[in-house]
Amino acid sequence: MALDAETKKSIIDEYATHPGDTGSPEVQVAILTQRIRDLTEHLKEHKHDHHSRRGLLLLVGQRRRLLGYLADIDISRYRALIERLGLRR
């Protein structure tokens, strides 16, 4: 369930902290969040797709680690990001 190039580019443009930024925690978390949302929709229709379910759990864990890292280095950036993404309601 990879993102198409256009979607990925729009996410990078929206969450980049500076021009050419593709690796900041904000960009990585935003991309992972979109992949998680897409995979969640897929699993609503295909309930027995356990291979994709495992992939979803891996993505959630990776996003959680990145968010923890961001919270450790700059709590204000962390809070701004979870607000923009609609996480931790």
Curated annotation (Swiss-Prot):
Listed Pfam families: Ribosomal_S15
GO CC aspect terms: cytosolic small ribosomal subunit
GO BP: translation
Keywords from the UniProt entry: Ribonucleoprotein, Ribosomal protein, RNA-binding, rRNA-binding
Gene Ontology MF terms in the entry: rRNA binding; structural constituent of ribosome
Function noted in UniProt: One of the primary rRNA binding proteins, it binds directly to 16S rRNA where it helps nucleate assembly of the platform of the 30S subunit by binding and bridging several RNA helices of the 16S rRNA.
Subunit structure of this chain's protein: Part of the 30S ribosomal subunit. Forms a bridge to the 50S subunit in the 70S ribosome, contacting the 23S rRNA.
Family named by the database record: Belongs to the universal ribosomal protein uS15 family.
Entry protein name: Small ribosomal subunit protein uS15
Species of the source: Leifsonia xyli subsp. xyli (strain CTCB07)
